[in-house]
Amino acid sequence: MLSPTNSISKTAPVPPQDSSKPVLISEEPQNQLLQKVARTALAVLLVVVTLGLILLFYSFSDLQSFPWCCQTRPSTKEQPTISIPVPLPSPPLAVPRPSTPPPPVISRPSTPPAPTPAISPPSTPSAPKPSTPPPLPPKAPKPVKTQEDLLPFVPEQVFVEMYEDMARRRIIEALVPAWDSDIIFKCLCYFHTLYPGLIPLETFPPATIFNFKQKIISILEDKKAVLRGEPIKGSLPICCSEENYRRHLQGTTLLPVFMWYHPTPKTLSDTMQTMKQLAIKGSVGASHWLLVIVDIQARRLVYFDSLYNYVMSPEDMKKDLQSFAQQLDQVYPAYDSQIFSVKIAAKEVIQKGSGSSCGAWCCQFLHWYLRDPFTDALNDLPVDSVERHENLASFVQACEAAVQDLPELFWPEAKALF
């Protein structure tokens, strides 16, 4: 048995090669070369087929628009430039189109509508020039708008009424000037000479909607003290001696309380501050005079507002005064147990067309009440506002003439009853 280490491999003797015979290529490298040639030919065929399909679907001018076509790339070496003649595309037919006319503008019927330009059928030019645009049709003329067209139509009667109202206001303001507290106090002093039962209460500082009730109660308390022979507890008037004031309280039967009102302030201190500011400016602003008559003899509270409801509605004011009348029955009871009644005098706006005649209207109403307290003189007022203020102007002129000789802020001397 032969061991593998000692075994001798038997090989065929290799004949000596002859250097004169050519060396033949083996079959395996030859097959690889054929495969490469076949692959290259197949790739070239696919490229040719693809380009052919592309040329079928796209024209040469479309191929030029692609970004990857005919692009120049920077190169260090100069390469020959191959110019391919490209046929120019045929120019499109230029068809003139009319421009869109502007939208119609609505104007007055008197202005005729703008004529619509006639549109001619498009014509094909033989040799159009692309650079020259087609002529545009003429535009329709725009209607000219005047200032009268922009303003809304207002009837002539409205202007006539506005002019008449403005003229009426100017006439009324010229007839009846605004009355301040000094003239009102002088008017009260003049009324005292005609009706001694009226006490000329000072109007500066005037009562307000916030303190007129306390002022009336204080005066009635002082009147009771004078009738008992006791000293008064309230404050004395600025321009009246204590003896003269006691005589006035003893013989008075009617208290004319003038109230100064402004709609802005909501407290007594704010009202006084507003009054000072308006006095410095010399303007009445939105201030208003009101009148409350306390008729002690007739046991009646009379409220007069020439603007009718400037402070509050007449119904609310009547309820407030009725509650106050019950309080006065306790403060100043009558010997026959008669209670105070309440009357709202104005049934409409009295001072139509005037904003500064409230003080004069309060004095006029007080004069009517003193003359006849049981006749309502407001029912006989003229309907026309100018005629109404003409009558008021006559009263104002008579009062201003009567108070010229009266001293400034000085109480008249009251006569002693006993």
UniProtKB/Swiss-Prot annotation:
Protein source organism: Chlamydia trachomatis serovar B (strain Jali20/OT)
Keyword Transmembrane included in the entry's annotation: yes
Encoding gene per record: cdu1
Membrane topology value: Single-pass membrane protein
Signal peptide: none
Lineage summary: Bacteria, Pseudomonadati, Chlamydiota, Chlamydiia, Chlamydiales
Record field: compositional bias (Pro residues): 86-141
Pfam families to which the protein is assigned, alphabetical: Peptidase_C48
One GO term of the biological process aspect: proteolysis
Presence of the UniProt keyword Plastid in the record: no
Keywords recorded for this protein, A-Z: Hydrolase, Membrane, Protease, Secreted, Thiol protease, Transmembrane, Transmembrane helix, Ubl conjugation pathway, Virulence
Domain of life: Bacteria
Cysteine disulfide links: none
Localisation: Secreted; Host cell; Membrane
Official protein name in the record: Deubiquitinase and deneddylase Dub1
Residues annotated as catalytic: 288, 305, 358
Similarity remark: Belongs to the peptidase C48 family.
E.C. no: 3.4.22.-
Function: Effector proteins function to alter host cell physiology and promote bacterial survival in host tissues. This protease possesses deubiquitinating and deneddylating activities.
Bias (Polar residues) ranges: 1-10
